[in-house]
Amino acid sequence: VHCESLEELRKLWFGENSSSIRQNPDADQSVEESFLDKETEFALELNNTSLYEEYLRQLLKDFLASYWQKNYLTHSWLAGRTPERFYIGNQFCHNLFPTEEQLFSIMDKMRSEGLEITLAFSYIREFMLPSVGKLLEKVDNWCCIHGMNVEIVVNDWAVAEMLHGKTSHLCPVFGTLLNKRKKDPRMKYKSGDISLFQQNSLNAEFYRDFLAEEFHIHRYEWESCGYPQEFPPGKNSLHLPFYQTNTSQYCPLYALCTTGDRGTQQLAEHCPKFCEKYALLYPEHLHMMGRYNSLFGVDKTFLESPEMWKKIKGIKPDRIVVNL
């Protein structure tokens, strides 16, 4: 199936005719009940300009109703609960972080609504170092004034170093770009022992100790990516249903829109936000799409079968992060 738009693709993946919505009478309802009883923290990502603007424009309940409706997940088991936390920013594209004015407006609104806050930073290019350092200082000051703690998702070692010397109000988190593992929607076509993929570097105790001692990192960001993972001791956040497979600082979508050739890539110094209107589409059976500077796969495992939560080996994530 070849879809004509991202909207059509989302409807095919998550709409009423999708197994993501259909209720399985044999499903273990205890998982959904424990989720609704808040045994696991629940968060949503605000990761692009349109979401920043919609959140600022609407009351929380109206924003959530619109969010689930636009993504065809109104009847999903996830939609039955109000998030306790929001992620602000994009882990994969530096041009999709909100403006400073937007950021503090969003943070003020979240504080008034009793929400916890996580700021997600991408890779940091050399020219960004001074501005990011100053922004972290302003966020630190905001936290001190309001008596709040804010998590900082780190996807560049420079940001981890910047957080040294800041107050305990800024809590570094190990981001997706640094938490590397093999991810590809085509892996389901491969034969072999997938158990070899279940662990990565964070399963090594000495590495976790290094992150804790050197950078005070105790939480790790993961993605649901189509096969079982063995999560390490500590605090683990699981992002779903989309997982990143490729990221380029030289945006292929920008190249395609400006030159007609996605291979003619260059740094988008003045980004016109083509990604607000356009995406790269692939045949539906591949379960993947291209958005802004990255490729993403979709893993509907937990949307379709929440009982799969019980099949996670080892430590279970203590936070679910929805990234539609």
What are these regions (language model features)?
Residues 1-106, 112-324:
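Active-site pocket-lining/capping segments in soluble small-molecule metabolic enzymes
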